[in-house]
Amino acid sequence: MRMLLSSLMISTGLVLAPSPADVPLRGFFPQSVQAERDLEARFKTMPDPAHMRESMRRLSARPHHVGSAYDKDNAEWLLNQFKSYGWDVHIENFDVLFPTPIERVVELVAPTTFKAALQETALPEDPTSNQQSEQLPSYNAYSIDGDVTGPLVFVNYGIPADYEELEQHGISVKGAIVIAKYGGSWRGIKPKVAAEHGAIGCLIYSDPRDDGYANGDVFPKGPMRPAQGVQRGSVADMPVYPGDPLTPGVGATKDAKRLTVAQAATITKIPVLPISYGDAQPLLAALGGPVAPAAWRGGLPITYRLGAGPARVHLRVKSDWSLKTLYDVIARLPGTTEADQWIVRGNHHDAWVNGAEDPISGLVAELEEARALGSLYKQGWRPKRTIIYAAWDGEEPGLLGSTEWAETHADELKAHAVAYLNSDGNGRGFLGVSGSHSLEKFMNGVAVDVEDPESRVSAWKRLQASRIMNGSTEVRHEARDREDLRIGALGSGSDYSSFIDHLGVASLNLGYGGEDDGGIYHSIYDDFYWFTHFSDTSFVYGRALAQTAGVAVLRLANADVLPFAFTNLAETIQTYVKDLQSLRDRRAEQITERNRQIEDGIFKAASDPRDPVTAPQRQQPAPQLNFAPLLNALDSLSHAASRYDKAYSRAVSEGRTAVAKGVNERLVQAERALTSTEGLKNRPWYVHMLYAPGFYTGYGVKTIPGVREAIEQGEWRDADREIARAAAAVEREASLVSGLATTLTGGS
C-alpha cells in the first residue's frame, strides 16, 4: 500500500521535483557548465558495486579496533589503494589514550546470585563471529576503573528527566548502581548524569523493545539484536571535548604535553559496563519497589520495577590505560588556479569489531569516489581546488583521528578549508543530509542529479515523497511548497565535529538509510555476513553515496564561484529563534503551573497513598528575555543574504571572472564568522554559535546552544548574555555577506 501510494503521487504529478536540466549549476559561469556536466556524467558511471563488495570483504575480514594489528594493516592497504589511484598519500600517526579491558565482572549477589556471561555468542552461520581472540570484549571505553557493590536501581534511559521521575517516587540512586537502557541520549550521558545524582556504578543494556525481537527476527534469522548481543561504545564526555582526553585542543603528537588520566575532564566519574538483554533480564527481574511507569517498560518478559533493591549487584571494571598509535590515511589531489583552497572528504576506517556497516559501508563508497577521481585525473582533468581524502582512525572511541589531525593542522584548515564532507555507515533507503545551512541549496542541487538506485527517481524526489507521505502536516506542506528540502543541523557523533564545531569549517554529513533497520550496532555481528544479507546487499546505495559525495566534491573543487547561499541560512536561523522564544514561553508556563500545583497541595492530594509521589522543589519564575539583539542581527543577515543572492546570480550568469577570486577567498571564511573564540560556557572547545552537541544529549544537536541550554536549565542570567553572543555572531555573518554582495555588484 505504501509503495502504491508513492507511485501514485509521483505518476500523477502531485510530487513535483525539478529535473536536472531545470536546476542551474550553482557556482559555474555559463561557459563552464557543459564541461562540468560532462565531467560529472563520466564520474557517475565509475563507482562499481562489485569493487565495494570486495573492498568490504577485505577491510572487515578481521577485527580492526584502535591498537589492533588489522587496524594498521587496513591503513597500509588503504595507503596502497590511494597510491594506485594516482593520489599523493601518506599516513599520519598520533599517540592517544585508548583504554582496553583487562577485567569485567557483573554479578547479582542478592537476593539470589547470577553472574553475567559478558560474552557474545559465535554463530555457525556467521564466519567472522568466532574471532574471539582478536575481538575487543564488550565494554565502554573511558570508563574509570572501579570495584563497587550496591543496590540496583532501574533508571529508564538515564537522562535528567528520568531522575526527576524517580525523585517524585522518593527513590534515590545515591550509593546505588543504576541500570539504564540504551537510547534516549548518547550513551556517555548516562554515567555522567548517574554520577551527578550520587550513583557509584552504571550498567547499560539494549532492550529488545528498542532493537531486539520486538522489531523483527533476531540475527542470524533476521537483522535484529540477539539475546547476547552487546553495544560497545565510548562514554568519554565528548560534549566537553572530543579526541584524545589527554591533549585537549592540541594534536596528540609524540612530543605533545599531556594531562594525567586523573586530570582528564572527559573520563567518567564512575565505572560503566554495557551488557546484553540476556544478561540484564535476571538483574531486572530481581528488582523490587514500585512498578516502572508504562513508558519505561521494555520488551523483556518480566515486571519492570524501579528498585532500589532488593537486588544488589557487584560491578568490577579494570582497563589497560596505555597509549595506542593511530593511523590516519591522508590523500591529496593538488589543485591548479585555487590550489590554496581545500575540499576535505572523510570517513573513518576503525571499528569496534569487524565493522562492515559501521564504518566500512561508508568507507568503500569513499574509496570508489577516490578511484573515479583518480581516473579522471589520469585522463587529464585537473581540479581548481586541492582535494583531500582522509580515512580516519580512532573515530569509535571518541573521534580521535579526525580531531587530532584537525587540531594539529588547525591554522592551515582555518586559512584554506572550504568545506568538509563526511560519511560514516551507509545503508538502503533515503538520502540523509545534515550540515551547514549555507550549503543547503547546493546539496539540493546535487540530490536532484543523483538517481535513487531502486526507485529510479532522483534522490531528491524520493526524499520529498517520503516527507510528504510520512511527515507532519507542517513537514508535508513545506516539502511541497519550499524550493529546497531542509537539511538537518549537525551536533556530534562522527568526524565532522572538529571541522564545524571547533574550527568553523562548513561541513556536511551524507548517507543513505532508513530501510534496513537492524540491531547489530557495535557488536560482533556487524560484519560482512550481516551486511550482505540484511542491508545494501547489492551495494547500489553505496554507489549512490559515492555519486552523491563525489559530485558534491567535484562541484566544490571546480566551481568558478563557491556555491554558498545565505538566504537559506538566514531563514533557518529564524526558525531557531522562533523555537527559542516558544521554548522560553513553555518553560515559563511549566514553572508557573508546577509552582501552583505545589502551593495548592495537588501532588499530595492526587498521589496514590499506597505509592505516594513527592512534590518537586519550587522553582523561580522565568523572567522575560531580551531577544531584540538576535532579531535585529537576523534582520541584517536576511537583508544581506537577499542582496548577495541577487548579486551572485547576476555575476555568475554574466561570467564575471574578475571578481571570482576575491569573493572565493572571503567565502572560505563565511562559516568562521559564526564562531566565537570564547567558546561555549563550560566547554570552550566548541566555538560555533549555531550548532553544538547537547551537554545532556551528546550526539543530538542543540541549535543556538548557549541560549537554548540556558533556558532548558533555568540559568536565566546566562540566557540574555548568550543571546547577545549569538547576535554578535549573526551580525559578523551579515557584515561579511553584505561586503560580498557589494563586491559582486562592482564595489570594492
Language model features: what each stretch is:
Residues 152-224, 336-340, 352, 367, ...:
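A conserved hydrophobic secondary-structure block that centers on an alpha-helix together
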Residues 653-748:
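C-terminal amphipathic alpha-helical interaction region
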Residues 208, 329, 345-399, 404, ...:
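Alpha-helical metal-binding/catalytic segments enriched in His/Glu/Asp
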Residues 388, 449, 501, 516-575, ...:
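His/Asp/Glu-rich mid-to-C-terminal helical/loop segments that flank catalytic regions of hydrolases
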Residues 113, 143, 226-291, 338, ...:
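Metal-dependent peptidase/peptidase-like ectodomains
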Residues 38-46, 60-69, 138-143, 177-184, ...:
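Second-shell loop/turn segments in exported
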Residues 22-38, 57-172, 177, 208, ...:
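Noncatalytic luminal/extracellular "stalk/propeptide" segments of secretory-pathway proteins
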Residues 130-165, 240-357, 371, 375-379:
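Soluble metallo-hydrolase cores and metallopeptidase-like ectodomains found primarily
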